[in-house]
């Protein structure tokens, strides 16, 4: 085998290494551009009308505690460690334990 054959055998693997690398690089750049274009088209645009969440706690003696008009229950707490409660008509917390000394309703509305 002559020197030109040896040189050819050395150059072929080197050319294969160079060519796929540049192809992969251009494929990566094309994919990056496509991903950026899609993300830019999905950009979040907030509504010009902004709302504020206002909340208050209403504590009552006994088992029920109701929110003021226009507010809705978002959570309840019951005295004597009672962890069993339900919301009635979206505006009233009702503790389900037989003995409860107080009930608190967390009431919120959007302004």
From Swiss-Prot:
Gene3D superfamilies noted in UniProt: Resistin head domain (2.60.40.4230)
GO molecular function: hormone activity
GO CC annotations on file: extracellular space
Subcellular location(s) of the protein: Secreted
Keyword annotations from UniProtKB, A to Z: Disulfide bond, Hormone, Secreted, Signal
Signal peptide: 1-23
Domain of life: Eukaryota
Stored CDD domains: RELM (cd16333)
Tissues expressing the protein: Expressed only in the gastrointestinal tract, particularly the colon.
Xref: Pfam families: Resistin
Disulphide-bonded residues: 55-108, 67-107, 76-93, 78-95, 82-97
One of the protein's GO biological processes: epithelial cell proliferation
InterPro entries linked: RELM, Resistin-like_sf
SUBUNIT field: Homodimer; disulfide-linked.
Sequence similarity: Belongs to the resistin/FIZZ family.
Function noted in UniProt: Probable hormone.
Name of the protein described by the UniProt record: Resistin-like beta
Organism: Homo sapiens (Human)
Higher taxonomy: Eukaryota, Metazoa, Chordata, Craniata, Vertebrata
